From Swiss-Prot:
It comes from Microplitis demolitor bracovirus (isolate Webb). Belongs to the protein-tyrosine phosphatase family. Coiled coil: none annotated. Residues 7-285 form the Tyrosine-protein phosphatase domain. GO terms for molecular function: protein tyrosine phosphatase activity. This is Tyrosine phosphatase-like protein N3. The gene is N7. It holds the Pfam family Y_phosphatase.
Amino acid sequence: MYAERSSNLSIHEFWRRKSSKYMKTIKSEHLFVNHTCWYEETPETKKRNRXHRHRSSVKSIQSLEPSVNGSDSFYASYVDGYDLKRKFIVVETLTSEKKSRNYWKLIWETNCRVIVRFDINDWKNCQYWLHNHISDYTEGEFNVWKKKTISHNYYTEILLTVANKKNGKSKQITHYEYHEHPDGKLPIESARFIFFLKMVNKSQENYNISASSSNKCARTPIVVHSVGRYERAISFCALDICLNQIRETKSVSVPSVLLKIKGQTQLDFFSFEEYLIINKILLHSKWALELKTEDDGKTSFFRSRVRKYCLIFKRASVF
């Protein structure tokens, strides 16, 4: 049963799943993901894993020095990429980055250079400190400066400098905040999200240029934080892994990817809504990715429609 539900599908098989049985298939996979406790679990190890399940947390955040602002506790876990170990750090249950000394300590000690933030609230009304006209602030031994803000229609890019007062050193960090909340219904939203993923990866690669090719661990992990919906951070990582799997193997298995992430994080339950969004974005990826298929004519037509749509509504094109 495990092999059947978690086996890889070729990209053509996956993209042809849009049929009368599509929702039934997705619901079955979703139940399987939520009721499987361990990645690559077998009936023989199921009982043992339930009793000895571990979490691959970055560190015990609660063991860090207490913050002057009171409680400063949250969970953070490494998540492997498709072919890169510890590519992401997923942050959970963090209420405020500004008031969290431990958050910036995590950023500093893991050598993070790219931060991705989601907020399910209306970002225009959000009181997030980076939206304000505050150019710098201090938390513990860390000084954080906003050097440049680049606003786009559906995301904001902020260049930060974080300085450590204890050793006098500083680091440049690129902070992305995604403003849209794709539901997978519109191909344009899916295309934008995929473009955003590719841009974040490019930014990380720029920081990793000097990394040794023999080192299979990310030198500068991407920190992903989602306010109000922890699952969105998980979806970001899952989509990145799935899209890389499609590029490299021309096949994909969403259940396998989520189960592996589940074994690395604090995730116990993944909503059907979020699982459906991942699958719909991947279904639309046939037009957003640069892949050679028999539908190349349709791909060209789709991209032309997207450009026209963006011109009419004065939005930035993803192509």
